[in-house]
Amino acid sequence: MLEIGSLVDGKYKILNKIGQGGMSVVYLAMNERANKQWAIKEVRKDGVQNFEVVKQGLIVETDLLKKLDHPNLPSIIDVIDGDGSFLIVMDYIEGRHLESVIREYGAQDQADVIEWAKQLCDVLSYLHSRKPPIIYRDMKPSNVMLRQMESHAY
């Protein structure tokens, strides 16, 4: 697990933990030279069975994602193959997961929901139009970010 305050790859300072999934932890990091925040997803060897197989899949996936260019998809900035972990540096999307918004506030305004659905359909259409098509198999409210002060779904 990355330490808060530690420096990764000589340039990314870990600020805090912002999320956790089944096999990964996501941190907010700062590239102090560029004065820019990034999200760093850490997949640890000790938290995954068949880590080498998972790592190879992540390498293929991140190589594919680096080539994507859509306003509602975070960009992959860097991949760091560390000793015992695999790190993916990506755009930090400031906002909340759709899941937490629904849990806290319940049903949402119809106009907002329609706008979010349009944006999600646009992203999925973009992914499906790639050659070969990209099929996103993990669509769920906890994987959709809603930006603050805007009605953009990521």
Regions found by a protein language model. Give the residues of each.
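Protein kinase glycine-rich loop
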Residues: 15-21, 26
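Flexible N-lobe loop architecture of eukaryotic-like protein kinase catalytic domains
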Residues: 19, 60, 69-72
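Conserved N-lobe loop of protein kinases adjacent to the ATP-binding glycine-rich P-loop
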Residues: 30-38
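AlphaC helix of the eukaryotic protein kinase fold
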Residues: 44-67
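Activation-segment/catalytic-loop signature of the eukaryotic protein kinase fold
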Residues: 79
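Activation segment signature within eukaryotic-like protein kinase domains
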Residues: 116-117
